Design a protein with these regions (language model features):
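Long, charged, mostly alpha-helical binding arms that flank functional sites
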Residues: 157-213, 227-230
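Compact, glycine/acidic-enriched structural inserts
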Residues: 127-169
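Gly/Pro-rich turn-and-neighbor structural signature
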Residues: 3-90, 201-258
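Long, contiguous binding/interaction regions
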Residues: 109, 263-287
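Short helix/loop capping segments that flank catalytic or ligand/cofactor-binding pockets
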Residues: 83-85, 114-116, 143-146, 265-267
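Internal mixed beta-strand/loop scaffold within catalytic domains of large alpha/beta enzymes
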Residues: 56-133
Length: 287
């Protein structure tokens, strides 16, 4: 059993609470669409490199009328990084021991006019402590109103903490969520941040400050995405629209399997395979 300190416990509790609220909000949308779909939860455990308890998590997934496939995962894991992987992790080169807790969400929607979405926030401990995460919108058929509303809500969350956050983190998302082999973006962006390091008071941003920002990212997502879904879920669509959706999902698959840091981290740390690949859509197409 993992032994958590006060900061690790607080972060884990927040991610689990946010999961519960997001799942309830998504189930409410399904009820409004005359669907009885609900999340099904599957707990999982992992072993560390020595075969001892290394934490685990809960994978939540729903297949519904509005949400064709949505997964909301929370995990809390710890152990030692493999030597070849430790060198690439902030603060792990000198000591491979780590702790990580976080929430990861991907929603693929039934109506091609409702954008897919990704949200992830996390807290890691190596010889350093930091937060990372973000949220990005992934429409097969972009709608400027949705894009503007999504970015405006994230901009407000960032501005409440640091005026440089949104310019920095939106550019980071623009650069990160990009498929180099195709020369195209994965979606219409959002924010992405990593290595938001926590310092002692007087030495830099504290745990409390960075944790407050990370909570506000989660709150911003919970506020804006259900509004976008409700605005678009009854939009009529054509076979051509569905073809665009399936082709876009193919690009999404390519990014997540080739470039996504979370996928690589999960595979390198003995994470739950079903939870790691939860981000993949139920159907996709390539032409």
């Amino acid at each position: 059993m993992l032994v958590l300190d006060e900061q690790q416990q607080a972060a884990r509790d927040w991610f689990e609470s946010l999961r519960d609220r997001i799942c309830a909000a998504f189930e409410k949308i399904e009820r409004e669409a005359d669907s009885e779909a609900s999340f099904r939860y599957t707990p999982w455990e992992r072993e560390d490199a020595e075969g001892g308890p290394g934490g685990g998590g809960v994978r939540g997934q729903m297949t519904g009328k509005v949400f064709e496939k949505v997964g909301v995962n929370v995990s809390t894991v710890g152990g030692r990084f493999a030597p070849e992987f430790a060198a690439s992790i902030h603060g792990a080169a000198e000591d491979p021991r780590f702790f990580a807790t976080g929430i990861s969400l991907v929603a693929h929607m039934a109506n091609p006019h409702v954008p897919a979405v990704h949200m992830n926030t996390r807290f890691l401990t190596t010889t350093k402590r930091w937060f990372g995460g973000g949220a990005d919108l992934n429409p097969a058929i972009p709608n400027p109103e949705d894009t503007d509303a999504f970015h405006a809500r994230l901009r407000a969350a960032c501005a409440a903490h640091d005026p440089t956050f949104y310019p920095r983190f939106s550019k980071w998302a623009e650069d990160y969520f990009f498929l180099p082999h195709r020369g195209v973006a994965r979606g219409v962006g959002g924010i992405f941040y990593d290595h938001l390091e926590c310092f002692e008071p007087g030495e830099g941003p504290t745990f409390e400050e960075n944790f407050a920002f990370t909570r506000d990212v989660g709150e911003a997502f919970l506020d804006i995405f259900p509004k976008i879904v409700r605005a678009r879920l009854r939009t009529p669509f054509t076979e051509d629209d569905m073809s665009k959706l399936l082709e876009f999902r193919g690009r999404y698959v390519e990014f997540n399997l080739l470039y996504d840091r979370g996928t690589l981290f999960g595979l390198k740390t003995g994470g739950n395979i079903d939870a790691i690949l939860m981000s993949l859509p139920p159907l996709a197409a390539w032409t």
